């Protein structure tokens, strides 16, 4: 599998990637010949050659279909897995190449810092007049918080991810130019071993993962990857500051992490008070175990003897205090360590950590106490010639404690507004609660939200579940500390009453502090086009409400609002979603500023462009002026977690990019663009007409039947990808009730990617017909928001394939003739205007590296897609009862997901 079309040209820096892909492709061929047969490999080559020829001629996939249709399920599954294995090694090669390129930049010196890194950000800031003093004033305000979620978009098993890490490690080791031939042979053997083990491991689990499984999955990235790179991130920033300004700064904590795993109740009956408590306990154990292990390793390093070197009086005093506090632990210290005060203190610190883990006497009351002990050691080492005798290792642990505390990651809780509304309606005995005016409901809720009256207790399941949740949060605050808890997010928030409802329920559940306030940050999530449009009014009403304003004063007069990228796109199309999000941020910031409240945004981004994915650096550059202000809180979902944080070097790069982008956007936001006043009405028109086209398509009669026939949504619903159902429980199959993730996933699998572009062409055409073509060209050239929007659409279009999409569409029978021509026409219109406004002859002309990456994969995705159509038709003929066909279809879904590198 190592032939390539001559039209694939690699730039000079990427030639090593080409060599890796060829070498690993040949290795995949060897694997297939060994594990299946030489005849099987020859058949794969015939299919691959046909797919490449089809791509080069841009013809319908009839030849591929004749080669692939009618195969036995097991034979079809083997074919899919063969092509999927190729994607696997290409993805690995590209990730390792990113590490290679990073090292190339580092070797070249700081005269050419890697773009979007910390060195690059600081150089740009200095060039724009930022002084060291200004940087020092801003750093304490920087707060970057990736929040990991367990949405069912990760289509790769944990067992396979671990083997992939082994393959990555062998390739990274091979980057060392000093490796001997024997060592290189060993590296190749390690890669082959992990690759073969992957081939012999089923692609998907036979059972749906539990919340505990998802918690373990996310915990792997937190404890095994990010735990290790956090100190390196701070060391990199220190070095960048010194290189740029010639001086150093004492760095505050800039990064922390959040999670939804175990706390996201929205539509998931498996998440409740028990998973909240269990998650917090599990995370506490995980991070304290890491600290204990690291202290154990430090014990042998910190063996300084008082006969040779002194220690600080403060450290000696702390040692004496701990010996009195923990006499049993002190007695267990070995006599031969009696002249090693650092080691003796280390023994007692481990005893305190163990007591913290066991909830026993002598426990640390808070992470700050452990930080204090570590700082004592650092100060003593620095004062006594120990900078090169353990100081570096101790400081790395200190950075970890500052970043992860005793909780590892802050746990958010999320629930849909209607669940709260039903509970309050039952508690107040008002069956018509939903039909009452929102202002009237808010007035009724005021006394309960303020604590003047107690919300009645009701003996029903809904109220009992919510009471248990708030009781669990109150207990968690006492047991784990306030830092362990993130926000309480209200999905599908529509008005002020939705927020006051949560405040009233929290009081009833016992989540009240000693001052009588509810110690909870309540975050409305605006996720439909209408809610984004009305969000400013909702926040104005909320901040003007005396009860809520009193609550907010106790929270530091800071309000967070979450912006939903997924459902707004499903609701009104991508143009209306993007523009609605942009306008909402501007209007919300203005409203909050007028009322004296600091507003921060929580971006609910998904993995794909359709759901707000893409490069953080470009997203922040395109964000409204003043919307960052030192803070970035963003969800990291599904396959994004593995892509960004699966390898230590790439995790470090991701953290650097986010931190650098926040620094740039905060200290030197983009200069105001006076033409934006003229551009906004143009964008209003684009969004409005795009929405009309999009809703006209997805709202057409029989559309949902077409969707269910022309995509593999029925297969996706049967897959065991996550603990949450694909639609909200107890609701029908209408589009409004389908989750955004399977909606996008299904269209991506069908290669049409409708949510990522449909309606954009109509919107742009309408603006041109209204006489705005020159403005659109200016916007594409000079407005980062619009340029990023068009670039993202171009990327989505590049990953689609109209010929393959037509094969899927024909599965819908008579509905094909009604819907597919509309897809074809809108696609042509969208491609035309995107290329025209970007001034490009072909999509992604400005990003040849991304274009090459997509072209590398497409000929290998096509056979899987064609096979998927054939299998889907046969499986549906059995009414979905043939398990062998289903297993082959699941393999197809996994293969396409690996190929396009997007699920939902």
UniProtKB/Swiss-Prot annotation:
Pfam family, one: PEPcase
Catalytic activity, reaction form: oxaloacetate + phosphate = phosphoenolpyruvate + hydrogencarbonate
Keywords, ordered alphabetically: Carbon dioxide fixation, Lyase, Magnesium
Cross-referenced InterPro entries: PEP_COase, PEP_COase_bac/pln-type, PEP_COase_Lys_AS, PEPCASE_His_AS, Pyrv/PenolPyrv_kinase-like_dom
Record-stated family: Belongs to the PEPCase type 1 family.
NCBIfam families: PRK00009.1
A Gene Ontology BP annotation from the UniProt entry: oxaloacetate metabolic process
Protein name: Phosphoenolpyruvate carboxylase
Enzyme class name: lyase
Entry cofactors: Mg(2+)
Organism for this UniProt entry: Xanthomonas campestris pv. campestris (strain 8004)
PROSITE patterns: PEPCASE_1 (PS00781), PEPCASE_2 (PS00393)
Catalytic center residues: 151, 570
One GO molecular-function entry: magnesium ion binding
One Gene Ontology term, aspect cellular component: cytosol
Organism superkingdom: Bacteria
């Amino acid at each position: 599998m190592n032939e390539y079309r001559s039209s694939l040209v690699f730039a000079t820096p990427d030639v090593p990637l080409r060599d890796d892909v060829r070498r690993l492709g040949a290795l995949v061929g060897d694997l297939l010949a060994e594990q299946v047969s030489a005849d099987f490999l020859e058949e794969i080559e015939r299919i691959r050659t046909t797919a490449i020829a089809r791509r080069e001629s841009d013809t319908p996939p009839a030849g591929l279909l004749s080669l692939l249709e009618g195969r036995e399920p097991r034979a079809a599954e083997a074919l899919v897995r063969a092509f999927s294995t190729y994607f696997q090694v290409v993805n690995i090669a590209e990730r390792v190449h990113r590490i290679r390129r990073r090292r190339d930049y580092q070797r070249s010196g700081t005269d050419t810092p890697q773009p979007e890194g910390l060195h690059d950000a600081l150089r740009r800031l200095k060039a724009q007049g930022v002084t060291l003093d200004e940087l020092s004033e801003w750093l304490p305000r920087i707060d970057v918080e990736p929040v990991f979620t367990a949405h069912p978009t990760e289509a790769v098993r944990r067992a396979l991810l671990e083997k992939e890490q082994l393959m990555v490690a062998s390739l990274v080791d091979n980057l060392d130019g000093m490796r001997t031939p024997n060592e290189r042979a060993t590296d190749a053997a390690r890669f082959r071993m992990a690759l073969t083990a992957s081939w012999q491991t089923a692609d998907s689990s036979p059972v749906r993962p539990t919340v505990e499984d998802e918690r373990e999955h996310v915990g792997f990235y937190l404890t095994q990857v990010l735990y290790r790179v956090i100190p390196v991130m701070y060391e990199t920033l220190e070095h960048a500051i010194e290189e740029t300004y010639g001086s150093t700064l004492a760095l505050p904590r800039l990064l922390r992490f959040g999670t939804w795993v175990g706390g996201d109740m929205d539509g998931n009956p498996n998440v409740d008070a028990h998973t909240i408590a269990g998650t917090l306990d599990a995370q506490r154990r995980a991070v304290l175990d890491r600290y204990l292990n690291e202290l154990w390793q430090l014990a042998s390093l910190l063996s300084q003897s008082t006969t040779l070197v002194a220690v600080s009086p403060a450290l000696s005093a702390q040692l004496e205090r701990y010996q009195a506090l923990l006499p049993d632990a002190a007695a267990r210290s070995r006599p031969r360590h009696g002249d090693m005060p650092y080691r003796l203190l280390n023994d007692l610190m481990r005893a305190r950590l163990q007591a913290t883990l066991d909830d026993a006497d002598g426990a640390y009351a808070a992470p700050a106490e452990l930080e204090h002990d570590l700082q004592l050691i650092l100060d003593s080492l620095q004062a006594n010639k120990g900078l090169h005798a353990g100081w570096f290792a101790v400081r790395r642990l200190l950075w970890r404690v500052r970043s992860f505390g005793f909780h590892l990651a802050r746990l958010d809780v999320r629930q849909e507004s209607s669940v709260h509304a039903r509970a309050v309606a039952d508690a107040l005995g008002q069956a018509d609660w939903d039909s009452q005016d929102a202002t009237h409901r808010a007035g009724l809720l005021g006394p309960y939200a303020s604590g003047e009256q107690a919300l009645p207790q009701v003996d029903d399941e809904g109220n009992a579940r919510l009471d248990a949740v708030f009781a669990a949060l109150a207990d968690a605050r006492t047991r784990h500390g306030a830092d362990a808890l993130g926000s309480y997010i209200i999905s599908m928030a529509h008005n002020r009453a939705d927020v006051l409802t949560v405040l009233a329920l929290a009081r009833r559940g016992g989540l009240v502090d000693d001052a009588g306030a509810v110690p909870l940050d309540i975050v409305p999530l605006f996720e439909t086009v209408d809610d984004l449009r009305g969000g400013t009014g909702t926040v104005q009403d909320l901040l003007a409400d005396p009860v809520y304003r009193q609550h907010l004063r106790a929270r530091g007069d800071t309000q967070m609002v979450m912006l939903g990228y997924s459902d707004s796109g499903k609701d009104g199309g991508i143009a209306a979603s993007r523009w609605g999000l942009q306008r909402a941020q501007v209007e919300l910031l203005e409203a909050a500023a007028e009322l004296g409240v600091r507003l921060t945004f929580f971006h609910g981004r998904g993995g794909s462009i359709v759901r707000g994915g893409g490069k953080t650096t470009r997203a922040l550059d395109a964000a409204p002026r003043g919307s960052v202000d030192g803070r970035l809180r963003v969800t990291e979902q599904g396959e994004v977690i593995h892509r960004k944080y699966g390898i230590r070097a790439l995790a470090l790069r991701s953290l650097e990019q986010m931190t650098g982008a926040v620094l740039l956007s905060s200290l030197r936001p983009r200069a105001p663009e006076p033409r934006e006043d003229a551009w906004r009405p143009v964008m209003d028109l684009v969004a409005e007409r795009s929405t009309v086209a999009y809703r006209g398509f997805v709202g057409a009669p029989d559309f949902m039947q077409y969707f269910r026939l022309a995509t593999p949504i029925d297969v996706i619903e049967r897959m065991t990808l996550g603990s949450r159902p694909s639609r909200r429980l107890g609701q029908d199959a209408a589009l409004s009730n389908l989750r955004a993730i399977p909606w996008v996933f299904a269209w991506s699998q069908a290669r049409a990617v409708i949510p990522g572009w449909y309606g954009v062409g109509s919107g742009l055409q309408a603006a041109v017909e209204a006489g705005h073509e020159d403005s659109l060209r200016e916007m594409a050239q000079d407005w980062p928001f619009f340029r990023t929007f068009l670039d993202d659409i171009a990327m989505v279009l590049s990953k689609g394939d109209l010929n393959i999409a037509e094969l899927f569409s024909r599965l819908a029978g008579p509905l094909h003739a009604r819907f597919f021509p509309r897809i074809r026409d809108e696609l042509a219109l969208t491609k035309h205007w995107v290329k025209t406004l970007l001034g490009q002859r072909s999509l992604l002309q400005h990003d040849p590296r991304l274009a090459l990456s997509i072209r590398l994969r497409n000929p290998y995705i096509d056979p899987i897609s064609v096979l998927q159509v054939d299998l889907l038709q046969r499986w549906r003929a059995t009414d979905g009862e043939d398990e062998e066909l289903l297993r082959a279809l699941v393999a197809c879904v996994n293969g396409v997901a690996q190929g396009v590198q997007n699920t939902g």
